[in-house]
Amino acid sequence: MASAAPASRGAARASTAARDAPFAAAARGPGRFRRDGNGRNRLVAVRAPRRWTTRAAATSGDANVVIKPKKERAKVDPNAVLQVPPSQIRNFSIIAHIDHGKSTLADTLLSKTKTVAARDMEAQLLDSMDIERERGITIKLNSARMNYVANDGETYVLNLIDTPGHVDFSYEVSRSLAACEGALLVVDASQGVEAQTVANVYLALENDLEIITVLNKIDLPGAEPERVKVRSIHWFPYDRVGVREIEDVLGLDTEDAVVASAKANIGMEDILENIVKMIPPPPDTGDEPLRALIFDSYFDPYRGVVVIFRVVDGNLGVGDAVKFMNTGKSYTIDEIGIMRPQKVPVNRLSAGEVGYMIANIKSVADARVGDTITTTKDSSTEPLPGYSEATPMVYCGLFPTDSDQYEDLRVALGKLQINDAALRYEPEQSSAMGFGFRCGFLGLLHMEIVQERLEREYDLGLITTAPSVVYKVYTSDGACVDIANPADLPDASVRDRIEEPFVKLEMFAPSDYVGSLMELAQQRRGEFIDMTYLSESRTCLKYDIPLGEVVTDFFDELKSRSKGYASMEYSFNEYRKSDLVRLDVLINYEPADPLACICHRDKSYVMGRGLVDKLKELIPRQMFRIPIQASIGTKVIASTSISAMRKDVLAKCYGGDISRKKKLLKKQAAGKKRMKQFGKVEVPQEAFMAVLKVDQNAGSGG
C-alpha cells in the first residue's frame, strides 16, 4: 500500500499535466479556443511567430538558433538638441486674424513634428495665460524649436515664433517678425481676409519676409471641401473664401497656397515642406561680432528676467559678458538654452538660432523688446535697426473700491510692470474717488487685460474711469504739454491750441452694411479716404479718424451695426489741431473729476445732455435734491436734478391741530437744508462708465 500511493500520485500528476498541456502551451505562446469532438470550447495552442520561437529556443539553450536584432528605421530624436548649419535652420512666425486658427495650427505643427509628446498636448499650448485661453487670443508671444526630417532626407530645425495679433501689440509683432525670414499667413477658408490679416501682412512685408499662404479650416461646411482639387486652391467660390481678396487686396501670389485644416490634421505635411523649400535660411555670419535681437522677455520670480532672442551675428554661451546696446546695461550669462517650448539648457547658440538667456536681470525694463545684445569685449558698433520704446496711447484712472486696498493696488501694479514694460502708472487723487493711479496702456485691449489681471490675480475691487488719449496742448508762450487726464487741461485763457491724435482706420464688412458703417464713421468725425470692393459681397472702408472717438464704444457700435460681421484695424497717423473743450460734470455743485472728458465743441451739448440724463438714471435718490450739471468753464450747458425722497412725517398725526403738522413739515425742511449742505453723494461705478454710453449720434464736428 505504501508503494501504491506514490504511484497513484504520479498518475494523478501525469493526468493533470495532460489535461493542462494546452493551457501550458498557450502560456508559452498565442492560443485560441476551438470546438472539440464533443462540441465544447477548448483552448488550443497555435504556432508561435518567429520572434517568439527564437526567444523560446534561446532560453532553452539551443545553440543552433541565431538571434538577429530587430532592424529599426533610422529616426531623429525630436527631443535632441541638434547642431545644424544655418542652411538647415528655418525661422518663421504665424500671422492671422483672431479666430482664424493660428494657435490650433501651432499646436498641430508641434504634434506633427513630435516636439511635444501626445500625453502633454493640450489646446493653445503656446498660450500660457488663462485670459489667452478664455478669450482665444494670443497676448504674450512664445517660441518653440522643432526638428523635422524633410522629404529630401535632411533634418531641419524649425523655429516657430508665436506672435500676438492685436494692434495694441503691433510693435512686439514687428520685432518678432524681424527675427524671422518667413511667415505663414493663415486665412479662414470661410471668412476670407479680415482687418488684422491686412495689418500683419504689411508688417511682414516691411520686414521683407517670405509669405506662405495657408487657407485654413477647409473641413468646415462653408468651405465645401468636396470640391478640393489636387495642388489647386481655386476650388473655393471667390465670394466665400477670399482667394481673390488675397491677390487683389494683399498683392500676394496664391499659386503656391496650401489648403489645410489644423484641427483635422489636413495639409500639415505640405506646410512643413513649404517652410523648408520656400523660407530662406538665415545668413551664415557666425564669425562676426555678436548681435542678437530681443523679441520678448518675461519675469520669473525665481530666476529673474528670461530674455528671448534671435542670434543674428556671431555666437554666445554660458559665462559670456554681454551688454544691451540701447539701455547700456551689462550682465554675465548664467544660463542659455532653447525653447521646446519648455526651456532646454545648452552651452552655446550660433547665428540663426533662437533661444533664451538668464543673466540675473531684475526688470523687463532693462531688457526691452527690440534691443540688441552684444558682447562687452569685441562688441558690435552698430545695433540692429527698428528699436523704439513702447508709448502708451490710452490712459484711464484705476481706483480701489475699498480705500484700504490702495497699497495693495500699488504693489500689484508694480508686479505687473516688472513683466510689462509698456504699462505706466502714477499716483492720482480725486475728490470723489480718493486715492488711485493714472495708468497708461498701449490700447483698449491692453487696458482690459491689465484690469482683469488685477481683479483676478490680486483679488482687487476696482473702479475704472473712462479712457482718454494723449493730447498735445500748446500754451500762449509756445510751450507744449502732453495731457492725458482731462482734469489737467490748462485754462482756455492760457491755451493757444490743442492737437489730438488721428489714426488710419480700416473696416472690413459685408457690402450690405457699408452705408451704416459710413454713417458711424462720419458721426465720429471720420474723414473718408477710400472704399475698396474685395469681392461682390465684401468691402473695405478707410478713414482718418480721431483716436479719442475710437477708444470709447466705437468697436461695440461697429459690431452692432454689422450684426457682428465687421472687423476693424487702426494705426497711428499724426496729431492734428482740433477745436476741443473740457466738459466738466458737477454733482450737487461739486466737480466730479473722474467724469470730466475732452470732446469737440460741436458735440459738447449732445455729450453734456446725454451725460447728465444718464447720471440721473444711475445715481440713487437721497433725502435731499441733487442737481447735476455739465459745464464748459463757468458756463452750464446742460442740467437736471434728482428729486429728493420724502419721508411722510405726518403719518403719526391722526387729525388734530394743523399747527402740529406745520411744525413737523418745517422741521423736515430744515433738516433737508442742512443735509443738502453737508450731505455726500455716493456715485456708483456704473455712473463713471456712463461717459462711454452717451449717445453721440446727433451732432458732428470737423
Swiss-Prot record:
GO CC entries? chloroplast
Q: Where does GTP bind?
A: 96-103, 162-166, 216-219
Q: Which family does it belong to?
A: Belongs to the TRAFAC class translation factor GTPase superfamily. Classic translation factor GTPase family. LepA subfamily.
Other information: This protein may be expected to contain an N-terminal transit peptide but none has been predicted.
Name of protein: Translation factor GUF1 homolog, chloroplastic
Mind listing the GO molecular function terms for this protein? GTP binding; GTPase activity; ribosome binding
Feature: compositional bias, Low complexity? 1-30
What's the short name of a Pfam family annotated to this entry?
Answer: GTP_EFTU
